[in-house]
Regions:
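Glycine-rich phosphate-binding loop of actin/hexokinase-like ATP-binding domains
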Residues: 1-28
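Generic structural signal for well-ordered, non-membrane alpha-helical segments
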Residues: 15-16, 20, 32, 66, ...
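Oxyanion-binding "anion nests"
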Residues: 19-51
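Adenine-nucleotide phosphate-binding core of ATP-dependent small-molecule kinases
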Residues: 37, 44-48, 54-87
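Alpha/propeptide regions of enzymes that mature by internal proteolysis
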Residues: 68, 114-118
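Glycine-rich phosphate-binding loops at beta-strand->alpha-helix junctions
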Residues: 92-110, 114
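Glycine-rich phosphate-binding/hydrolytic loop that grips phosphoryl groups
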Residues: 124
Length: 124
């Protein structure tokens, strides 16, 4: 997370990191208050999946939109983790927290498989 919860990884209803020009376009098209509502309450996994903000529900749904939302989340998790591992010049462990981190075993496994290059392995 950066200045606000809108930065960083995509969340249930928050966009995560987004190009500043996209925000300017949203403001031009929708106004400031509506844009704030869109980015904070109608984006993230909810917007990507077409209506589901909870990873548990996404994992139970076989739709292409839900699969895309999960793939997007895993991809950006890998990008963030990779940049942090590089900045720290390695790592000793990864701890998953929060609802997704604690309960979404499949999502954790997908992310960790993508970090095998850094010596990461799944330890359940």
């Amino acid at each position: 997370m950066g200045y606000s919860p809108l930065d960083g990884l995509t969340m249930g209803t928050r966009s995560g990191g987004i190009d500043a020009n996209a925000v300017l376009r949203l403001v031009a098209d929708n106004g400031l208050e509506r844009t704030k509502a869109i980015l904070n309450h109608e984006s993230g996994l909810l917007g990507l999946s077409g209506g589901k903000s909870d990873m548990r529900n996404l994992m139970l749904d076989a739709s292409a939109d839900s699969a895309f939302a999960i793939e997007h989340f895993c991809y950006w998790s890998l990008r963030h983790a990779g940049s942090l591992i590089a900045a720290m010049e390695g790592l000793d462990a990864i701890a998953f927290t929060g609802g997704i981190g604690e309960n979404a075993i499949g999502v954790r496994a997908r992310i960790l498989r993508g970090l095998e290059w850094a010596g990461v392995r799944l330890d359940v």
